[in-house]
């Protein structure tokens, strides 16, 4: 059950290296910065904002650059991780704060973890949802993803690399594509074991949506919620959002000086037991004693898919607020 708001949501725009960045805030107290993933917006945190405000925090959910009402630079390399980290720093400064707890989901978890790694003086703690922390390093990302799936299938990350390719699939029917994508990764509507995996595209002219469920919405997603997401992407297009994937090799090169580096601040991880983003990275979770020495707890929610804070808002809110309370001592 969603908590009743303790104060009205406040929309505002702040200046960042990207130009402008839209955010929504609620509550007063220590700053908690919420960073969404793909393909989402600040709205993905709609059930966390009132809960955090009620618990005594200034909760701020941003539209990451390239999304929603935030700036959308044209250059592909404007979506490199280093720039997204500086956006987060700029938000904290623009809000008149010196530090914040940063919490991210999906790509937002990566952005949050690198923000904490590179700017520990600003981000005093980090919460990660769905995507575990894996330190910079390893083989070149596109080399890894290019080998996944074999000769018949292409991994979705590789499919997203070529500018315009995924846009051509998604943008003619944004609403239908989003509905299918959200359903494909939700616990109550994801394909059954043995059915074609929606993380892959058939190499012979296939589309991602060919493997999505049709005619069904997950329980967490109402038609009104879908209207919000679809309306934003129908207005903005998908290129800014997809450009995050197109910077993975650049990030790998630029973060090389931090190869293997741990995040030492207090941290929290919450994953879904049915989420491929969590299960495929089980080795990263096993390495947490080394990579997240400040880890307070790591939780896997049973029967939960990828959209964790929307699928299981009450549990996520409780875990977040309990953890945040430990940081105030």
Identify the role of each PLM range.
Residues 46, 113-117, 317:
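Short, hydrophobic alpha-helix immediately C-terminal to the catalytic nucleophile
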Residues 27, 95-98, 327:
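Glycine-rich phosphate-binding loop signature in dinucleotide/nucleotide-binding domains
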Residues 24-71:
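Conserved HGGG/HGGXW glycine-rich cap/lid loop of the alpha/beta-hydrolase fold
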Residues 16-25:
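A short loop-to-beta-strand scaffold at the N-terminal edge of the catalytic core in hydrolase folds
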Residues 39, 64-68, 133, 275, ...:
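Alpha/beta-hydrolase active-site loop signature
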Residues 4-9, 21, 69-103, 107-296, ...:
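Flexible "cap/lid" subdomain of the alpha/beta-hydrolase fold that forms the substrate-access gate
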Residues 1-12, 328-329:
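Basic/polar N-terminal segments that are highly enriched at the extreme N-terminus
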Residues 295-329:
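Catalytic active-site module of serine/aspartate enzymes centered on a nucleophile-bearing elbow/loop
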